[in-house]
């Protein structure tokens, strides 16, 4: 395993188990399970983050609903076929379980990657400046993770001018955001959840 590639993508999460681990898939005879972690924000709101964890880390663990746990890992993506369309699915891949730390930031992510689509700068109805961008982060075995990021204010203006291929270091938190999607032929929009990095620090790398 390339240590440098591990350093490209680092996540620390500490929160409460919202759903019991459910079997997800198997790779080379190793089972992987998925669960949701509920993590508080300073504002009082919460983020619900999907986590993928190996059966090897679950040995001797129960992970009851409401139990607080801490993990270190990586923010990863994969493509899933849904209604004959490829959908980008995001999850935190747990690499290790940690001791709880009341002093720690409960939700922090750091990635080194490349802008892989032209950034989209916009202003909200409340005059907040926002830029959405998609980052490609190299992973072992010639794979890449594609991570949506959202920047604010002066950071939004800065990255809004950058070109595809620019290498950036990004620090922030993983957030879950509900939105409504209008489906063809349906009267009521469908409530969906997006996962992205809310960027607090960005710099050229």
Language-model features: where?
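OB-fold and OB-like single-stranded nucleic-acid-recognition modules
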Residues: 1-205
